[in-house]
Amino acid sequence: MVRFISFTSPIAALLLLSFGVKHASTASTNTCIVANSDSDDAITIAEAFEKCKTGGTVVFPKDSSYQLNSIVTTSDLKNVNINFAGTIHLPAREESYRNGDYYIQIKGTHIKMYGGGTINGHGQAWYDALDHTAPSVLRIAANDSIIGGFTIINSPRAHLNVTNSTNLVLHDFTLHTVSNNSYLPKNTDALDLYHSSGITFRDSMLTIGDDCVAIKEDVEKVIVSNVTCRGGHGYSIGSLGIGGRKDYVKHVNFRNSTCIDCENGVRVKTWAGGKGIVEDINYNDIILQNVDNPILVTTHYCDPNVIEYCNGNDDNSLNISSIHFKDITGTASALGNPIVNVNCSIESPCSDITFSGIDITKASNTTDNVCVYLEGSDEVSECSS
């Protein structure tokens, strides 16, 4: 079911020689072309990865199409190229997938994934059912890897879920999820990050229904650059500290990115009662066009179903410090919310939050900026406008 090419054959050896010594020395040992299954292409995809998981190349040919009827889990990949030029269709909505972690997992070290292919999440059935419990489309747990250059459409939930990864570059993604009716796609974050370090996300176009980027628990050393997001919930730190959990996020740089018609622009959100730290977060050269909440820092994040817990723990949250907003420009929406809204906790006030080059045009009904429990707010000009 998997076409398996050995590079020990005489023909393959001649091909390698034709590419020169440099290419031959770095070429993968085997190539596995993913075939179709009679019942579930998840089976043949798994076979291809198993046969080429060490030093191989897995190929989804251009114009090929694959229908998944179960999840795909790959692990222990080492020095693997994934030439993803085809189309993968995720399964139809079924109860068995509710609250699952992912549909496809890529896990290993030194992975290169490219090719211009498409994953179609067929999320409309989930939106129509008001069911926000679908798995993420693609989970990545990869070290020293480069993944990108392909498209995810109609995601039933988060598009990219990155966890337990180090030194990972994500680039040139097109993520496009919209509903064809009034039932909107919920929880369809473009990128969620967990338990990772040294992550770059760049050069991507996003049209989604939730966070453009959500940097969640225990993440550090992140760069987000040259990303355009439409209709999302902004470039977010968090949410963090749910249920009193101890989390951290530090050393994050968002730069040269745009948010258009977004609910939030740049945002830090932590739960009431949470523990831990958020520090050294930098937003530079961000354009916000028609955004409801341009700059938002809150330690009072909560879900309606646990509002009693949040109200009882509202006096403290994570320690938020060294958050810098520089050259944030654009326009606020007609919703009338403040340009700057910093709302921290009495027992864990925010500190060292700075603003420079903030040039966001107000709507006629925009209310005054808010700075609550921000140390040194008397000396912050944005807190008096």
From Swiss-Prot:
Its main location: secreted. It holds the Pfam family Glyco_hydro_28. Optimum pH is 4.0. Its EC number is 3.2.1.67. SUPFAM superfamilies: Pectin lyase-like (SSF51126). One of its GO terms (cellular component) is extracellular region. It comes from the Eukaryota. One of its GO terms (molecular function) is galacturan 1,4-alpha-galacturonidase activity. This is Exopolygalacturonase rpg15. It comes from Rhizopus delemar (strain RA 99-880 / ATCC MYA-4621 / FGSC 9543 / NRRL 43880). The gene is rpg15.
